[in-house]
Amino acid sequence: LCFAPQKRIGIPLTVGQSKQIDLTLALTSVDQQVTIEDTPSVVNISTQQTSGLVDERQIKQLPLNGRSYDQLITLNPGVVNYTGQRSGSIGTSNSSVGNMFAISGRRPQDNLFLLNGIEYTGASLINVTPGGTSGQLLGVDAVREFNVVSDTYSASYGKRQGAQISIVTASGTNKFHGSAYEFLRNSALDARNYFDQATIPEFQRNNFGASIGGPIKKDKLLFFANYEGYRQNLGLSDLTLVPDNASRAAAVPSVQPLLALWPIQNGPDLGSGIAEAFSSPIQHIREDFGTTRVDYNISPKDLFFAAYTIDDSTANTPTQNPLALIN
């Protein structure tokens, strides 16, 4: 008699995940062997951390407003999208230009984003969350999966006490594959804002891009590249208090040039020489995102990869100050 050999295969491991597999050795004759394939999900008893995986199928197929894939973080329990409560607006120097999430009751500033194991920061002043001036986290096609880990995680994570969001970029395969797309949204089908006048303010958003991946050398050297562009012209509904027409007409000649700097009244009089002026100044946003990745399979057990990611963006947000020259 001897111990029967045990073998388990088909146990997937995702980013930031560990599993403990217990095998029971039994006495048997030398000609008996037990093999188990495609085992069901194993309960994680090796750590006490709370985690949630968002896989490639969810990232690619679930609808997203603006193609900002970090919105899918809210699929996990204990996550609240805190973006609407932040101060400032898109294109301004606020606490963060990307989306913000309160996870397990902690502040959004406590979270840490990792891209392929490296800290992933954005364009904000304090670099809390990734993202450009559009307020989106672009690169949906470039992401294979991401995992959100919170609460009593291991010492392999650190720097911030909040959730750790680990993002893994997509890689090439032995077959060439690619995609091209454009999402268009404009004001033709939009409703008029309560403060708008007879015409609907301009709103045009173009989300476009392409990706391609495949083999450089089959089974050995693979590549993947992705580009995504974002263009938005948004008419902001602006209500300003200005001198009324009667005040302009009664002003002395030396004051007339100063009053000319204010918008012309096009709303009702409020009394005391003040009236309302409605306008729709245009906000312009441009963002370009790109990433490339090369994988080299050194051996069945060793993999080397290199990835490069760039996000370049600008925003021109008009102000309500009548003396400003920005448009």
What are these regions (language model features)?
Residues Q32, P40-S166, A170-N327:
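Acidic, glycine-rich flexible loop segments
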Residues L1-D55, K301:
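Periplasm-facing N-terminal accessory domains of Gram-negative outer-membrane beta-barrel systems
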